[in-house]
Amino acid sequence: MLIDFSKMHGLGNDFMVVDGVTQKVFFSNDVIKKLADRHFGIGFDQLLLVEPPYDPELDFHYRIFNADGSEVEQCGNGARCFARFVRLKGLINRDRIAVSTARGRISLQLEGENQVTVNMGVPQFEPGKIPFRAQKAEKTYLLRAQEHTVMCGVVSMGNPHCVIEVPSVADAPVETLGAIMERHERFPERVNVGFMEMVNATEIRLRVFERGVGETLACGTGACAAAVIGISQGKLKERVTVSLPGGKLTIAWKGPGQPVYMTGPAEHVFDGQIEL
């Protein structure tokens, strides 16, 4: 069976995007792993699947699969590419798009010059909603992981994030400590690990080790999580520029109970077909 797809990226965080509205598709874990292989497949960080809405009040349902085949709840860079994809493919003729994910609803707004603003929803600090094993919510936690002792902030942006402040992201042990923290026993669903360097009150540098993927050039939910942690700790202002290896995102958050807004690019690379 031939499947149409598009290759897209948000700041180098790359995706295979598939229309599951006009074509019937099913992807097993093994198939996703093969497609994700950068030597023998298409190559991507995540596969994004556009499905008909589960709720008639919404436009689409948004599913995300990591390169290891695992399904995850949210992907911010993917959300921007999702919005541009459905518009490019004529699946919708509006610039404001409402979708559901495994963890709730998000709204997408197409802007000019391939920019998309995403309402990422309200961040969750309650341990049970992250999920994270702790008796109560704290602004920082001290975690021990093998020979490391880590001070971090923990939050859910629809998926779990652990944010570690470092003096320099260039020297941060992203691959080693990221892999250890991803599977820390206090995160029952594993965790995305961000390494954040404070530049000033309106700018940070960030590298992210994504669960099920490893380090990526950009992570939208990771950028949101880092900004939210910095703002909640009183170190950052309400609007933050996040510099990632793949480029920059703008994150805005007014505080507890308020949604996080992320603005950044979504690029279409090519269209293709593949036999499944």
UniProtKB/Swiss-Prot annotation:
NCBIfam families the UniProt entry points to: DapF (TIGR00652)
Principal cellular location given in the protein's record: cytoplasm
GO biological process annotation, one example: lysine biosynthetic process via diaminopimelate
UniProt keyword Amino-acid biosynthesis, yes or no: yes
Lineage: Bacteria, Pseudomonadati, Pseudomonadota, Gammaproteobacteria, Aeromonadales
Domain of life of the source: Bacteria
Active-site residue list: 75, 219
Catalytic activity annotation: (2S,6S)-2,6-diaminopimelate = meso-2,6-diaminopimelate
Assembly description: Homodimer.
Keyword Amino-acid biosynthesis carried by entry: yes
Its job: Catalyzes the stereoinversion of LL-2,6-diaminopimelate (L,L-DAP) to meso-diaminopimelate (meso-DAP), a precursor of L-lysine and an essential component of the bacterial peptidoglycan.
Organism: Aeromonas salmonicida (strain A449)
Protein's cellular compartments: Cytoplasm
One Pfam family named in its UniProt record: DAP_epimerase
Protein name as it appears in the record: Diaminopimelate epimerase
GO terms for cellular component: cytosol
Annotated substrate binding sites: 13, 46, 66, 76-77, 159, 192, 210-211, 220-221
UniProt keyword list: Amino-acid biosynthesis, Cytoplasm, Isomerase, Lysine biosynthesis
Enzyme type, top EC level: isomerase
